Amino acid sequence: MTRPVTGKDLMIVNMGPHHPSMHGVLRLIVTLDGEDVVDCEPILGYLHRGMEKIAENRAIIQYLPYVTRWDYLATMFTEAITVNGPEQLGNIQVPKRASYIRVIMLELSRIASHLLWLGPFMADIGAQTPFFYIFREREFVYDLFEAATGMRMMHNFFRIGGIAADLPYGWIDKCLDFCDYFLTEVVEYQKLITRNPIFLERVEGVGIIGGEEAINWGLSGPMLRASGIPWDLRKVDRYESYDEFEWEIQWQKQGDSLARYLVRLSEMTESIKIIQQALEGLPGGPYENLESRGFDRKRNPEWNDFEYRFISKKPSPTFELSKQELYVRVEAPKGELGIFLIGDQSGFPWRWKIRPPGFINLQILPELVKRMKLADIMTILGSIDIIMGEVDR
C-alpha cells in the first residue's frame, strides 16, 4: 500500500547545545527538507552569567577578573576595553612604554584567537591534520603570555594607567624569535590549506555576504572586511599607539567563507609586523602612570619610598567615575568590542553595556544557511567565529 503524498515532509533537528561543532553551548533548531536547510533558529543564553549586572556592583579593578570570562580566548581585548573607559573618563595618560606593551599583548592575543579559530574550523569541515600544527604555534604564544603575566589564559594584566608589571628579562628576544618562526609557519598553512582542492570545495561560494548587507546587519571585524569593506578600528580610532606602526588593513571582496579565512590568515601576518615594530622601538620609562594610584589627591606621596618599590604588587585604587556617558571600542579578533559606560560619581558604574562582536555577527546565521545544505551549517558557523562566553555574557 502506497502512502498518499500530501506535501513536503519537513524534519526539525536540534543541533547542540552539546554538539562538538557548536563552539560552546549554542543550540540550533534546524528545519530540513531532506538535506536542504529551510529554516534555522539559534537559541542563546545557556552561558548567561549576568556580566553587565555584576559590573554595577564592582569597582573597575574588582571587575577586571570577570571580563576575561567574556571572550576567554582573547582576554587581552576585554581587559583593554575595561581600562580604556575609566582612563578616558578620568583623562589618565598611559605612559608610552605601557602603550607599546599593550599593543604587543593585544596582537599576540589576536594571533592566539585566530589560531584557535583556524584549528577547530578545519576540523569542522573534515581536515584533522592542520589542527595539531596550529595548536603547536598557539602553545608558543601561551608560553609568552605565561612568562609576562603569570597566566596562560585569563591574564588580568591591564591596569588603569598602564599594566600590572614590566616585561621580564629575555622576553623581548624570545618574542622576536617567535615572530621569525611564525612567519614561516603561516607559509606552511597556506601550502597545506589554502591550495587544498577539497578545502576550497567546502568553503568557496558558501555563506556569501555582500558589503551593503554586512553593514545593514551591523557586522564587524573579519566578517565585514571579507565583504569588501576595509574598516578596522585600529586605523579609524587610532587607540593605543597603532598609528605609530606601518601595517595594512586586510580585506577581501568575495564575502564567502573562503574570504573570511583569507582575511584572518593575513591578519596574523600583519599582527607579526606590528609586534616586531613595537619590540624594536619599545621606549624606556615607566610601565604605569603612578599618579593614577593616588587615593588622596591632596597628599603628595613619595613614590621613591621603600614601600612603593614593588608597586605592581599593590592593588589599584577605586576610581570615582564622573557623571558622564562614554562609548569605548577596540578592534577585537572577532570584530568591534565595545562598552557603553555611564558614571554616577561613585566607584561603581551606573550602567555597563557590553557590545559583543560575536553576538551581533551571529544574527546573520539563519539568513546565510537558508537554501544551503546541512553540512554547510558547520562551515558557515565556523567561519563566523563565535565564543559563547561573549555572546551570552
Curated annotation (Swiss-Prot):
User: InterPro entries, per this entry?
Assistant: NADH_Q_OxRdtase_suD, NADH_UbQ_OxRdtase_49kDa_CS, NDH1_su_D/H, NiFe-Hase_large
Q: Which reaction does it catalyse?
A: a plastoquinone + NADH + (n+1) H(+)(in) = a plastoquinol + NAD(+) + n H(+)(out); a plastoquinone + NADPH + (n+1) H(+)(in) = a plastoquinol + NADP(+) + n H(+)(out)
A GO CC annotation recorded here is:
chloroplast thylakoid membrane
Name the Gene Ontology molecular function terms of this record.
Answer: NAD binding; oxidoreductase activity, acting on NAD(P)H, quinone or similar compound as acceptor; quinone binding
Q: One Pfam family, short name please?
A: Complex1_49kDa
Q: Is the keyword Translocase in the record?
A: yes
Give its localization: Plastid, Chloroplast thylakoid membrane
Biological process GO annotation list? Answer: photosynthesis, light reaction
Regarding the membrane, this protein is recorded as: Peripheral membrane protein
Q: Which UniProt keywords apply?
A: Chloroplast, Membrane, NAD, NADP, Plastid, Plastoquinone, Quinone, Thylakoid, Translocase, Transport
Q: Which family does it belong to?
A: Belongs to the complex I 49 kDa subunit family.
Role played: NDH shuttles electrons from NAD(P)H:plastoquinone, via FMN and iron-sulfur (Fe-S) centers, to quinones in the photosynthetic chain and possibly in a chloroplast respiratory chain. The immediate electron acceptor for the enzyme in this species is believed to be plastoquinone. Couples the redox reaction to proton translocation, and thus conserves the redox energy in a proton gradient.
UniProt subunit comment: NDH is composed of at least 16 different subunits, 5 of which are encoded in the nucleus.
Q: What is this protein called?
A: NAD(P)H-quinone oxidoreductase subunit H, chloroplastic
Q: Which organism is it from?
A: Lobularia maritima (Sweet alyssum)
